[in-house]
Amino acid sequence: MEVQLGLGRVYPRPPSKTYRGAFQNLFQSVREVIQNPGPRHPEAASAAPPGASLQQQQQQQQETSPRQQQQQQQGEDGSPQAHRRGPTGYLVLDEEQQPSQPQSAPECHPERGCVPEPGAAVAAGKGLPQQLPAPPDEDDSAAPSTLSLLGPTFPGLSSCSTDLKDILSEASTMQLLQQQQQEAVSEGSSSGRAREASGAPTSSKDNYLGGTSTISDSAKELCKAVSVSMGLGVEALEHLSPGEQLRGDCMYAPVLGVPPAVRPTPCAPLAECKGSLLDDSAGKSTEDTAEYSPFKGGYTKGLEGESLGCSGSAAAGSSGTLELPSTLSLYKSGALDEAAAYQSRDYYNFPLALAGPPPPPPPPHPHARIKLENPLDYGSAWAAAAAQCRYGDLASLHGAGAAGPGSGSPSAAASSSWHTLFTAEEGQLYGPCGGGGGGGGGGGGGAGEAGAVAPYGYTRPPQGLAGQEGDFTAPDVWYPGGMVSRVPYPSPTCVKSEMGPWMDSYSGPYGDMRLETARDHVLPIDYYFPPQKTCLICGDEASGCHYGALTCGSCKVFFKRAAEGKQKYLCASRNDCTIDKFRRKNCPSCRLRKCYEAGMTLGARKLKKLGNLKLQEEGEASSTTSPTEETAQKLTVSHIEGYECQPIFLNVLEAIEPGVVCAGHDNNQPDSFAALLSSLNELGERQLVHVVKWAKALPGFRNLHVDDQMAVIQYSWMGLMVFAMGWRSFTNVNSRMLYFAPDLVFNEYRMHKSRMYSQCVRMRHLSQEFGWLQITPQEFLCMKALLLFSIIPVDGLKNQKFFDELRMNYIKELDRIIACKRKNPTSCSRRFYQLTKLLDSVQPIARELHQFTFDLLIKSHMVSVDFPEMMAEIISVQVPKILSGKVKPIYFHTQ
């Protein structure tokens, strides 16, 4: 789509007419004067005025036909052309005399079936005859664009400088430009004949600039004035010499229409590229180009407007004249490659006055025309990354598709760096894209059948991901999301071709490869990333498995001394010190606790020795021992293992037990229902965080499925908090009050004030049971761990079998703790019965509290009780499952 810059906004190109401003001719003429100072003769042939319509050009050609022939004859004879007086709407400048060649009648293309007039060419992508620029006479309204400082849309600027300022100012309107254009068409022929009859040889340039001696200086001053009025910088025009070459990205840069003597060198291959594009496009039929006309037409037509006669194109090469572009040079084509362009300067952010009213909305098939501010220097990383872009295509960035959507020959593809960001799927948004032989958007002409072979060794197949080896960039640049960045193949720059069969079932051009959906097809993560051997305590490099955990030598020695010694370590902080390689010696208490959490035990080495001894003895005495002796030996070993494992398990439970958590309640404020319940909710939020950490540190808990871990914690958190609060009340206040936290203790008054007196009474009774049964700390720790595995969904967990085994192991540990201090089996059974009954009594209390908290959450906005986010989520999602019977506790005894 060709976008024209308007005053303060951007207008799209109308479907039938292109509005072009006069600043192109202004800047072009000023540029030529700056680069070629001194008196020159006007050029013999030039382009028709860009603002004139097709009918006006035909009428002007018919009126001036005799004089054009006379001019051509004079050019053939070699007679010098004198200065002619141009129309009042032009400011004629002296230029270098160019020999004019006779214009040959163009031959009509046999496939087009049209008979164009002399000077007419077929517009690319449309098949419509377009008037070629004809050499005008001195009295023609369409003065040569190379001799004019302003186009025909400004007919009165040569006689009055005030009009120039008015039109160039932002206050000028499009209506004034249209009126002046109509006046120029009507008055051009009569004024030209009058000047020819009078024989006045003087040019309006002399009247305006004051003589030929000051042409260069006046042009520079005028150019500076125009730049200042339009908000442009004028530093680019300072210290310009005749042979100085301007930069290609500047608006005053010389283009292909400039004579070869002053044309910059980088533009020579560009002219050949554009000329080859015109040669290929001129030979194609209308039917071939109709498919991708919205893309090809905008690009090729713009090249025809520039009249690239220097490369021998079919459209403009027959005349043999150098003609200036009629489009704005600010719209840089995709083939430009300027290495010396300023990357930080922007010459495009300024308003341009357009000759015409604001055009209508864009047509359904706009011409694709991309304005690029920087050179097209995209490396291989961009070409590779474009594979993921919804508009990108690797085949269209390089290789056969590099010549542009309208290119149909390999030569054009090789000489151009055109690329497109439009794919065939976006036809409804950006115009119909080429398909088949013509092929737009990455399927260019000659390589459309066999597929474009890019320098990267990759061609995009019709379906899925092709496994073609070649010079790819780094795989982590273009791999789809969810795929690991390292590949286990010999060459890191190739794609595994075996991926194709199982990737066809996924959606998307490359397959929706995610670890969740393709877990069965992707190797384990340890295959790509070898496990790091680091110490589980401090993170230093581990030296081996010591005392049941992978640790370094320093932590190994520390644990041996700390566990065997009788010294008690206390943390000066809150039992949450950071233990790493540099700070592991700061807090021995937290370091020892972390050792227990990692599973380090002094009995691990003894158990290993006992196990090896057991296997050795069984192997030696397998043939000599009797069944009775063998059974007794197994019982002895199991009895030793039981006594050895008992302190290990208790040491772990003691090390991971959470500390005291405060509720943050303000006891200076009067007690109220909202304040007490809000403090309880805040305390529950803080304790829930500690419960999660404690549960993850329990032996065997991490072996559960992740979903089972979350479910077990979310269902049992209320019972765990009630059981722990009862123990704190028993140890701190002898079960006379409810010791929720050091700053939140409930007495009788607060129990009534909180409107949960019945629940508080039952919790106080539970706390008193600890005293009546004389529960030991070891029994409490084991019972609390067993309480975590005492409530599950009715439908079961995802790994119910492992959950049952883990629960049974904790029951056995509780039985071992009971049997540790009691030698009488009868007393052990009685004690086990008492402790399990106490565990069963926790479940009804937890259910009542679930119902209370759920009702409170529903009407919390009415009673002004605050619920933390995590508490509100668990109560609203998980508690209804318990209340509805979908989740039930596991009882030891029949209720």
Swiss-Prot record:
GO terms for molecular function: androgen binding; beta-catenin binding; DNA-binding transcription factor activity; nuclear receptor activity; steroid binding; transcription cis-regulatory region binding; zinc ion binding. One of its GO terms (biological process) is negative regulation of extrinsic apoptotic signaling pathway. Residues 547-637 are annotated as: Interaction with HIPK3. Residues 567-894 are annotated as: Interaction with CCAR1. 17beta-hydroxy-5alpha-androstan-3-one binds at N681, R728, T853. Residues 1-533 are annotated as: Modulating. Phosphorylated in prostate cancer cells in response to several growth factors including EGF. Phosphorylation is induced by c-Src kinase (CSK). Tyr-510 is one of the major phosphorylation sites and an increase in phosphorylation and Src kinase activity is associated with prostate cancer progression. Phosphorylation by TNK2 enhances the DNA-binding and transcriptional activity. Phosphorylation at Ser-65 by CDK9 regulates AR promoter selectivity and cell growth. PROSITE patterns: NR_LBD (PS51843), NUCLEAR_REC_DBD_1 (PS00031), NUCLEAR_REC_DBD_2 (PS51030). Keywords: Cytoplasm, DNA-binding, Isopeptide bond, Lipid-binding, Lipoprotein, Metal-binding, Nucleus, Palmitate, Phosphoprotein, Receptor, Steroid-binding, Transcription, Transcription regulation, Ubl conjugation, Zinc, Zinc-finger. Binds DNA as a homodimer. Part of a ternary complex containing AR, EFCAB6/DJBP and PARK7. Interacts with HIPK3 and NR0B2 in the presence of androgen. The ligand binding domain interacts with KAT7/HBO1 in the presence of dihydrotestosterone. Interacts with EFCAB6/DJBP, PQBP1, RANBP9, RBAK, SPDEF, SRA1, TGFB1I1 and RREB1. Interacts with ZMIZ1/ZIMP10 and ZMIZ2/ZMIP7 which both enhance its transactivation activity. Interacts with SLC30A9 and RAD54L2/ARIP4. Interacts with MACROD1 (via macro domain). This is Androgen receptor.
